[in-house]
Amino acid sequence: MGSAFPNSSFIGIDFSTEAVNVALTEAEAMSLTNVDFYQQDAAEIETSEKFDFITTFDAVHDQARPREMVASIFKVLKPGGYWLCADLCASSHLGENLDHPIGTFGYTVSCMHCMSVSLAYGGEGLGAMWGAQQAREIFTNAGFLLSLIHI
């Protein structure tokens, strides 16, 4: 995004110091001067800045504190700002996922990675198949208006 939009500035955060270091190295290799990365818990974003646009990809369900993460994102968005949250398209109800094209994979990955990561930190353990219904509830409770949901 930094190279595609040189007149914009980008900040990335990750819980993992290693991931942040890799991102910083990649940005330096690409000679990007409009990007920066910080090690932070997304449930407690520490910045005085407000953002026009925030993105998360396949991330909310892995968090130890997903509700706090979503609330933290809402807090740092400018009024009228947008959050693009891309996640696996599923239902929050197991029975509605029986014919899901990658349902078995989603539940397996959840047990072996997503939930394990979250639960290791005393988290909620949503998993990849947390579903649209639960996402809507979490997002609206944080204050988001859901103007577009593509499922």
Question: Where would I find each of the regions flagged by the language model?
Answer:
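C-terminal alpha-helical "lid/dimerization" subdomain adjacent to the S-adenosyl-L-methionine
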Residues: 86-141
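A short acidic, Gly/Pro-enriched loop at the edge of an enzyme's catalytic core
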Residues: 43-54
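Conserved SAM-binding strand-loop segment of SAM-dependent methyltransferases
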Residues: 30-42
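A short glycine-rich, Lys/Arg-flanked "PGG" loop and its adjoining helix->strand segment in the class I
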Residues: 67-79
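Conserved SAM/SAH-binding beta-strand->alpha-helix loop
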Residues: 16-18
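Conserved SAM-binding motif I beta-strand of class I
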Residues: 9-14
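Conserved small/polar residues in nucleotide/adenosyl-binding loops
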Residues: 149-151
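A short SAM/SAH-binding and catalytic strip from SAM-dependent methyltransferases
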Residues: 52-66
